[in-house]
Amino acid sequence: MRAFCLVGLVILASISTTLATKGIDLSASFNNFSCVKNAGYSFAIVRGYKSYGEVDTVGHQNLKNAKAAGLIGDAYFFPCKGKKTASAQVTEFDNVFGSEYGTVWIDVESNPSTGCGWSSSDHTGNCQFLQDIVNAFTAKKRLVGIYASQYQWSTIMGSASSCAKFTSHPLWYAHYDNNPSFSDYPKYALGGWTTPSIKQYVGDTTLCSVGVDLNFY
């Protein structure tokens, strides 16, 4: 019986990995998404808004190219806290992208752009700024998710458990263990989410001659 159970667990793990839906995210200009699809990937998340406060028109074209190749297309939004209001940034993005994507993922990580960084001390203000962005998108009837890692969330919001206001929205979390599985999430949980929706499990790799991160759900 013990041997049977062990074999069963191995089979179930194999099935789970086989059934995983894999995708990429990228920021570089790219037009060979058919190569990505043929490599076994089903979705692409393109950069839609740049860290210094500007719509990514390259990302918009990437989205069109990805969908034309038969991939599911989402966008990620790297907000600038400081130069423009949350509402202004969302409006700029929405004027270009409209409803062409499935979900827009708000990128919560350190921002290197001058005048656009999250506050190092006002964690409550950081949480409110994220709330303002989410509110602006939901007011436009867009589907919104959050992208973060436990480390980045803790740094920006004050702790891993802080700013637990967004659990009604899907979570895309990053943990680079080269394992397309959510089994690690309890150790790397953040923001009050008990269940993630997407995992970024490989960062800064190359696929079809373009720089990407690898994801699964």
Label each region the model flagged.
Residues 19-27, 35, 164-217:
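Functionally critical loop-and-helix segments that line ligand-binding/catalytic clefts
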Residues 137, 141-155:
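Aromatic-lined carbohydrate-recognition surfaces of secreted/lumenal glycan-active proteins
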Residues 103-105, 155-159, 164-171:
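Accessory recognition modules or surfaces
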Residues 19-142:
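Substrate-binding cleft of extracellular glycoside hydrolase catalytic domains
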Residues 113-115, 153-156:
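Short catalytic/ligand-binding loop motif for oxyanion handling, primarily in non-cytosolic enzymes
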Residues 86-94, 154-163:
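Distinct, well-ordered alpha-helical segments
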Residues 2-20:
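Cleavable N-terminal signal peptides of Sec/SRP-targeted secreted and luminal proteins
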